[in-house]
């Protein structure tokens, strides 16, 4: 997964465009959300904040990313990923991935950046692109639940991230 993370960062930096995980469902065009933006990441629900080890206002991931070619923040990500020695992390392999190439790496870079640099990075609000947390997505997909709670989550949604995380199976 770390190689794939690095490849998508390189591709987005060089060519620009949009990357979306396979476990996303598009409900409607996100064009109104991203119009005029140069770098975007999808925000995650608060219930996913556990383990990051840092108090932050907004938690986001690399499951949906958009940027123009040569965006400075994407360049910063690439530099950090390829300069990381990796031998500093004595932790579970899942956490290691999150910290070296995944969301925790991105969030540390984002929150360590100057506020003036962060203004150019749009964190797409969770109600638009990640209306469900992990447990809600399981109830919606696997149990086919159609409760008022879940339906209310979808009222403003442009996309749904189901958080299948198939890559976790590979890192046992």
Describe the predicted segments one by one.
Residues 1-5, 20-172:
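Glycosyltransferase-associated regions of secretory-pathway enzymes
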Residues 5-17:
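Small-residue hinge/turn detector
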